[in-house]
């Protein structure tokens, strides 16, 4: 079993795009990435040969724009949202749940880079769908 990521590690890479299937075909053909559709969503999970797993999905309502967002593992999304604002960052979304997996919030650093916080649900650590700790 691989070592679990430590807080502060990038644990997920996400492509926010208008046409997910085009992106999947592009990266799959170039690099051999395998994509697994998530039932009931315009979203697929992928794994590259190494590095963090990721996702490709259609744009979501609200503060979502085309681009790539890296997810950083934290012990508490709530605590880090406060710390980000105190450090001069901006919170772009409320804390949201990925059912059965964990919670996230989008933020922007003082230079304008968009990133996300990820808090793993401890109950999900031993499930087959857990791609953030294996």
Residue spans of the language-model regions?
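N-terminal beta-strand motif that seeds the catalytic metal site of vicinal oxygen chelate
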Residues: 1-24, 51-52, 67-70, 120-134
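Short, acidic/polar N-cap/turn motifs at the starts of alpha helices
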Residues: 12, 42-43, 93, 104
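Vicinal oxygen chelate
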Residues: 19-20, 72-114
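Catalytic core of tubulin tyrosine ligase-like
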Residues: 27
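Conserved acetyl-CoA-binding loop of GNAT-fold acetyltransferases
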Residues: 30-35, 88-90
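Conserved short beta-strand elements that form part of the metal-binding/catalytic scaffold
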Residues: 32-67, 110, 114-120
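Conserved catalytic-core motifs of GNAT/GCN5-like acyltransferases
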Residues: 34-40, 93-98, 122-125
